[in-house]
Amino acid sequence: MNRSENLFFSGSSLASQVHAAAINGDKGALHRLIIGNSALKDKEDQFGRTPLMYCVLADRLDCADALLKAGADVNKTDHSQRTALHLAAQKGNYRFMKLLLTRRANWMQKDLEEMTPLHLATRHKSPKCLALLLKFMAPGEVDTQDKNKQTALHWSAYYNNPEHVKLLIKHDSNIGIPDVEGKIPLHWAANHKDPSAVHTVRCILDAAPTESLLNWQDYEGRTPLHFAVADGNVTVVDVLTSYESCNITSYDNLFRTPLHWAALLGHAQIVHLLLERNKSGTIPSDSQGATPLHYAAQSNFAETVKVFLKHPSVKDDSDLEGRTSFMWAAGKGSDDVLRTMLSLKSDIDINMADKYGGTALHAAALSGHVSTVKLLLENNAQVDATDVMKHTPLFRACEMGHKDVIQTLIKGGARVDLVDQDGHSLLHWAALGGNADVCQILIENKINPNVQDYAGRTPLQCAAYGGYINCMAVLMENNADPNIQDKEGRTALHWSCNNGYLDAIKLLLDFAAFPNQMENNEERYTPLDYALLGERHEVIQFMLEHGALSIAAIQDIAAFKIQAVYKGYKVRKAFRDRKNLLMKHEQLRKDAAAKKREEENKRREAEQQKGRLSPDSCRPQALPCLPNTQTDSHKQSRAPSKQPPSSEAAQDPDKRACRGGPGRVSPSRAPQKEQHLSPDVQGTVPRKPNESPREQCKGRSACVHFSPSEGSDGKRHPGVSSVEKSRSETGGEQRCDKGKGFLKQPSCLRVAGPGDEGEDPGWAAASLPQQDGHRKPSRRQDTASKAKCTSQKRRVQELRGGRHSPAGSSRPGSAKGEVVHAGPNALQHRTPRNKTTQDKLAGGIYSDLPQNTEVLRSGVRKSGTSTLSEDAQVSKETDPAPGPLSGQSVNIDLLPVELRLQIIQKERSRKELFRKKNKAAAVIQRAWRSYQLRKHLSHLLHMKELGARDVDRWNRECLALLLQVWRKDLELTPPKTTAVTRTTKSLSKGSSGAKSTRHSVLKQIYGCSQEGKVPHSTRSSRTHSVLHLNSVSNLQCIHLLENSGRSKNFSYNLQSATPPKTKTKLRPSLEEECVRGSWNS
C-alpha cells in the first residue's frame, strides 16, 4: 500500500495497527501485538479481511509465516467468501500458494461466484500455479463448475491459453461440458479475433476431432464456425472448415448459416472460402427466404457482392415476398452495390416488382434515399409504376415526408394527379403524415386542396384526424374548405372534436368552420355531440362559447319552426279552398249569364225575322252615326240618350228589346261614363243592370271583315257595304232622334281588302244608304249575307285556335274582338282614359296595322272633317274624361299572327321598361337612405371608441338613430294583419326578441350558405371585427335590440356569441317603448 494508507492504519485503532503491520511487513510490531492480544491474529477489517490476507496482497511472506505459526486461520474468508488461497491464485503468486497448500488450505473453497482457486489460476499465462493446484486435486475435481457452469477448461479457452488447455485435458478434463449458454470450450476458443487462437482450437480438436464436437450448437443454434465467422478470424475458419465433417450450411435459430454471417459483416475472403468449400452446391436461405446475397446487398458491401455474383452457384433469387437483392440494396441506399450489380449483370430487370407490386424505386422512395432514386431514374426506372394499392413511388415519398425525394421524382416526370384504390391523392397521404412542407410542395404543383377520396374525405379532414396543426394551417391558407362533408356527413371539425384536439378546433373556427354541421346518418351528430361522447370537457366549453349546438337542441328548434310552418300552411289551405269555392261559384254564375244571353239573342233574332215581314219596319232609316252624315244630325242623335225612356218603350217588350235589351237601366242611374254614349255606340246586345261593360263585351260576337265588296256595276269597290247583307246579322236596333222607327245598324262592317286600289277613302258615305233612300233587301241578299257571316265566324274560330282568354286577362291580345264603328261616335268609349294614353294607343298600336285597314286608322286620326271635330267637342261636353279606345279596337283575332305578335311584344316591352324604371328609382332611394344611416352609425361608433365624455349626448344620438331607423321601417313596411289577436303587452315583450333570436339561431344551424349566399372564402379571425361592423350597419331595426329577451327563449344556451357590451346602454324602459311602438304601428 502507499504511505497514506499506512499512516491511516497506524493511526487508528489497535486492530488497524495489526493490519498495518502486516501490510508494512513489520514483523516485530506484529509479534508484539499478537503476544499482547492473541485475538488480533484473525481480526477482520471493514472488508472482512484478516492480517494473513493483507500479507498475501502485500507479498509479505515472512509476516504470513509468522501469523501461521501463531495459529492464524488459513481458510478464513472475507465478505466475498474468498480465502487467502483465492487471493494468491488470482495474483498468480506461486510461493504463497505453496505455503498455504502446505498449511492445508482448502482448494475447493468457492466464493460468491462459485469460483475455486483453480478457475482463478487460469487467468495467468504461466501454468505453474495451475499445475500446483492440480497436484493436490483428485481426478474428478478438475471439472468443478462455477456459477455459469463453466469449468477451468472454459476459462482457459476463453483466455486463449493453449498450455492451460493441454494441462487440463491431460488431467482428464471433459471438453464437451456445456455452460449456461450451451457453449463448449471449442466455442470460446473459436470466438476470438486473435489469429493465435488457432492453437487453442487445434489443442481441443486434437483431443477429440469428432463431428459432434465440430458441429456443436449452443442454445441459439450457433456452431464454432458461426463464432469464427462473426469475429472474422480467417485462420480459425480455415482450420474448422478443413475438417470434412464440418457443416458449412448449418442453421442457427434464425435460419442463418455461417455464409449469411459472413455476407452480413462483409468478410469477402471468408465468403470466398465458404463458397469454395460448400460441397452441397446450393445457397441456403433464411426464414424469410433471403439468401446471403441479400444480406451483402443491404449492407452495401460491393466487394462481397462481387464475390457472390462471380461464383457460378449464386443466383439472385427472390425472398418470400418476391424481393430480389437489387430491391434490398435500393431500400437500404446501397448505391455501390447497385452500380456493381448493374455493371456485372446485364440482364437485370430494374423494374421487376415484388408480390405487392413494388419496385426498387418504390423501396428507395420509401426509405428517402435521394441518390438512389436519381441512380435508378438515370437507368430508366419507371417513375409511375404502381403497386397493388395503386401507389406510385411518389405516394411512398409523400407518406414518409421525404421532400428531396418528392422534388426529384416530380422533376423526373412523376404524375401528381393520380389516386390510389381508395381515391386518396398525394395530398391525402401527406396530410395523414402531418407533413406541412410536403403539402405546400404538392399544392404548388397544382393539386386541388379540396380533393375528395371515394369516402368524401378531404386532406384537411385527414390532417384534423391526426391533429396536425401546421398541416391544417397550410391547407386552409391555400383555400381548403373546412365545411366540406364526407359521405357520412362528417367535417374536419367532427374529427378534431372526436379526438380532443383543442388547438385544431380553434384553428378551424378561425377559418369560418361551421360548428353545427350534422351527419347524414340516423344519429345526425354535430361536432359538439362528438365532444360530449368523448367527454372532452375543454372542447365542450369552447364549442359552447362559439355557438355550437347538440342534435337535441337543433331538434327542439326544428320542431318549433315546423309547428309554425304547419300553422301557416293550414291558414293558407283554408284560404285557398275558400278562394277556389268562390271562383267556382263565379264561373257558374258566368255560365248561367252566358246561357241567358244566348237565349236572349235567339229570341231577338226570331223577333227580327218577324219584323222583316212588315214593310214599315224593314224601311231603311238614316244613319246619323256614319261618317257621311251631317253634324247636326250627329248631335241630335245624342239627345235621346240623355232623356229617360218613354213609357211606351218601357211597357213594350219588343221595343225594349230593340233599344238594347230588357235589362237596360235608365241614363239617370247609369254611371257617368255610360250616360253620354248614344244607342249607336252602346251596341245592340242587351245588358243586365248588374253587368259591367267588360262582361258585356265578352258576350258579344262582333267581327270585322277585311275583304273587298262588289258594287252595282259589277266592279269591286273598296269598302262598299251592303246594308241588306248586314241587316240579317244585326242583334238589335238603335233609336234615332229624327227617325220615328228603328234603325238597324250592322254589327259586322266590311273593310277594304288589300286588292282595292285607287278608291276614295271616304267609301262609307257613298256605300251606306242615306236617310231619305229606302231599300228593301231581297231574300237572296239575306241568304248571301248570312252565309258570309257564318264563314267569317268560322274563320275567326280557326284563327283563335279554339282558345278563349279568361275573363279579366291583362295579356295583350287576350280580349275578344269588338265592333269597329266607322262613324264619329267611334271616338266615344265606355271607360275613361286620359288623352296621353289615348294618343299612345292611337299612334302606337294602330300604327302597326297594314294599309288595308285605313278605315280603322281614319276612325282614330281623321282630323280633316268637321264631323270629327264636332264629335270631339260634343264628347267634351258630355264626358270630361274621354274613354279608352277599346270601343273602336278591332278584333285582334282577325289580324295576321306576325302583326299580333308585334303588338303584344311592344306592349310587353313598354310594361317591362316602366317596371325597371320604378325598380331603379326604389334602389337608388334605398341606397341613399342606407348610406346616411351607416354614416350616422359610424360616427356614433367613432365617438364611442374615442371615449366620449358626454354620455348623455351619446345616448341621445343613439336614440335619434334608432328612431330614424324605426321611422324608415314604418314608412317602407306595409301594415300586416295577423290572424290571431294578441295583446299589446305580449307583442311588445316577446315578438321582436323571438324573431331576431329565431333568425340568428337558424343561421347558426344552417350557416350562411343556407341563406342563399355564396360561401365565404377562408379568412382569418382578424376579419371578424369587420364582418361585425357590417352586420351592425345593417338596416334591420330588429337587430339593434337583438339581445333583448333572447335568454328567455330556451332553457339552455343556444344563442351565438353575443356582441361585446358597451359601457352605456339605452334604458330598459326606452327599449321597451321602442319595441312596443313598432309593434303597435
Curated annotation (Swiss-Prot):
Top-level taxon in the UniProt lineage: Eukaryota
GO biological process, one term: Wnt signaling pathway
ANK repeat coordinates: 13-42, 47-76, 80-110, 113-144, 148-177, 181-213, 220-250, 254-283, 288-317, 321-350, 356-385, 389-418, 422-451, 455-484, 488-517, 523-553, 1022-1050
Location(s), subcellular: Cytoplasm, Cytoskeleton; Membrane; Cytoplasm, Cytoskeleton, Spindle; Nucleus
CC per GO annotation: cilium; cytoplasm; membrane; microtubule; nucleus; spindle
UniProt topology in membrane: Peripheral membrane protein
Protein name stated in the entry: Inversin
Species per Swiss-Prot/TrEMBL record: Canis lupus familiaris (Dog)
Top-level taxonomy: Eukaryota, Metazoa, Chordata, Craniata, Vertebrata
Gene that encodes the chain: INVS
